[in-house]
Amino acid sequence: MKAHIQDKTKLVNSVFNKVYKKYDFMNDLMSLGVHRSWKKNMIDWMKPQSNQNLLDVASGTGDLAKIFSLKNNNKNEIICVEPNKYMLETGKAKLNSFKNIKWKLAAAEKLPFKNDSFDFYTIGYGIRNVTNIHLCLKEAFRVLKPGGRFMCLEFSKIENEILNGLYKQYSKVIPLIGKYIVGNSAPYDYLVASIEKFYDQKQLANLM
């Protein structure tokens, strides 16, 4: 079990070591920009108040943190947690003007924060990549304040057979796009495989 965890940690880290320079561009290209609408819709639905703080885990380049911050004119206290140092530095540079956003290099399974610290916990397209989802969820609810909200945005299996068939065809193209843009198809082979192997919506909800 320990060897499996170490292997996945190493694999995921190597994936982001390869893609961090083109991460935002590839997200826009692969989703035709739709991922930005999904993120905005989630934050809009949360309706954060200016006195509420946020922990954004597996933050990537900080899209969710930025949208959250702009909802209240950058008055919220926000901490972005990112396990990959290159992704963290990219996100930190991108959001350098947001003085209310702090960055921390840490894993979702071992958060360096006290119990009952945050009003919101967000994780966008990151929970597939954690090495121990049970520990990740345990840590999430540990650091949330009583009544705090856990918000997860993630890819999952498509129940509609026609749409699922179209996605399966498109998923074959994703690694080819990655090879052309990033120079390496392996990270996008991992992306496609991780979505296919991940829990469906009901299974993930049951874990919580």
Regions of interest found by a model, annotated:
Residues 134-149:
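A short glycine-rich, Lys/Arg-flanked "PGG" loop and its adjoining helix->strand segment in the class I
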Residues 119-133:
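A short SAM/SAH-binding and catalytic strip from SAM-dependent methyltransferases
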Residues 46-48, 72, 95, 144:
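A generic alpha-to-beta junction signature in SAM-dependent methyltransferases
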Residues 10-11, 81, 153-207:
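C-terminal alpha-helical "lid/dimerization" subdomain adjacent to the S-adenosyl-L-methionine
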Residues 32-50, 67:
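Conserved alpha-helix/loop element of class I SAM-dependent methyltransferases that forms part
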Residues 1-24:
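N-terminal, positively charged/glycine-rich alpha-helical extensions of SAM-dependent methyltransferases
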Residues 109-121:
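A short acidic, Gly/Pro-enriched loop at the edge of an enzyme's catalytic core
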Residues 53-110:
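Class I SAM-dependent methyltransferase SAM/SAH-binding core
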